């Protein structure tokens, strides 16, 4: 009788271990961590690994150090707009081209060009905003540039008309769906 009880207890313990393992697999974390691996694998005896001698590098030729390549700083590329689209330019000049320090006329030292996808109904084009930078020939510390026009969505390249077109198109699709849903419910 006690032998039957012991075998039933062993079987019960085995079944509880299986249920616990399956519950862990079903409801536990979904990544491959030590808890999801068979617990007997973690108890492998690898011996004393600290007694392994280090390999001698006597017969290895010394590596000649060449010039290190400079790492370029990562540059953002949010994508170039297609070249086949027509472009128009918008030139934004500073309010004054007179140097605030010495009152001489400023000369152009560079430009910043940004592009945004603009849409006029049935015409898609690229709007180029050009902002020249001006500097004084007498004093090299002053650079004047008109402030950039505000973007609709952060650093995106979408013009306000393009965004308005997308929103109007999305609203039109939504209204069409609501009309269809309403008419199908009215027929019931």
From Swiss-Prot:
InterPro entries assigned to the protein according to its UniProt record, in alphabetical order: Transposase-related, Transposase_TnpC_homeodom, Znf_dom_IS66
Keywords, alphabetical: Plasmid
Top-level division of the source organism's lineage: Bacteria
Pfam family name, one: zf-IS66
Chain segments carrying region Disordered: 57-80
Family to which the UniProt record says this protein belongs: Belongs to the transposase 25 family.
Protein name (record): Uncharacterized protein y4aQ
């Amino acid at each position: 009788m006690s032998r039957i009880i012991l075998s039933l207890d062993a079987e019960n313990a085995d079944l509880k271990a299986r249920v616990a393992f399956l519950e862990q697999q079903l409801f536990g974390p979904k990544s491959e961590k030590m808890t999801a691996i068979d617990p007997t694998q973690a108890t492998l005896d690898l011996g004393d690994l600290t007694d392994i001698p280090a390999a001698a590098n006597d017969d290895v030729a010394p590596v000649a150090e060449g010039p290190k390549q400079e790492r370029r700083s990562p540059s953002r590329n949010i994508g170039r707009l297609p070249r086949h689209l027509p472009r128009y330019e918008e030139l934004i000049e500073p309010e004054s081209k007179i140097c605030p320090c010495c009152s001489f006329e400023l000369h152009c030292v560079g430009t910043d060009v940004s592009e945004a996808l603009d849409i006029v109904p049935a015409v898609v084009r690229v709007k180029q905003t050009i902002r020249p930078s001006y500097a004084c020939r007498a004093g090299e510390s002053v650079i004047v540039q008109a402030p950039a026009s505000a973007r609709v969505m952060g650093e995106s390249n979408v013009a306000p008309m393009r965004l308005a077109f997308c929103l109007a198109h999305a609203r039109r699709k939504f209204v069409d769906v609501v009309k269809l849903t309403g008419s199908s419910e009215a027929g019931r």
